[in-house]
Amino acid sequence: MRGGGNMQQMMKQMQKMQKKMAEEQEKLKEERIEGTAGGGMVTVVVSGHKEVLDVIIKEEVVDPEDIEMLQDLVLAATNDALTKADDVTAQRLGQHTKGLNIPGMM
């Protein structure tokens, strides 16, 4: 069979890549990524799996007369953390798919 060895080598390479990616996914679960808003008045911490782990609000930003501002800050900090989590994930997993031209892969 022509090219059979090449296909077998490619399959081994894919299996190796899958194993490394699974290991990176596990590491990402333990990663803590912070997003902030309002000059650090609100901080949201997420895992690499995009699970919100903590929300920290400094006392001086709490104004009962302006709840909307606090809501906006929490939303902005959350979105910042999630964007950073996406960046970390793309960087970590992308290093294992570099050079491969497989549709649907990073």
UniProtKB/Swiss-Prot annotation:
Family affiliation: Belongs to the YbaB/EbfC family.
InterPro entries xref list: YbaB-like_sf (IPR036894), YbaB/EbfC (IPR004401)
Region (Disordered): 1-34
UniProt GO molecular function: DNA binding
Biased composition (Basic and acidic residues): 20-34
Quaternary state and interactors: Homodimer.
Organism from which the protein derives: Macrococcus caseolyticus (strain JCSC5402)
Subcellular location: Cytoplasm, Nucleoid
UniProt name for this protein: Nucleoid-associated protein MCCL_1934
Keywords recorded for this protein, A-Z: Cytoplasm, DNA-binding
Major localization listed first in the record, in broad terms: cytoplasm
GO cellular component: bacterial nucleoid; cytosol
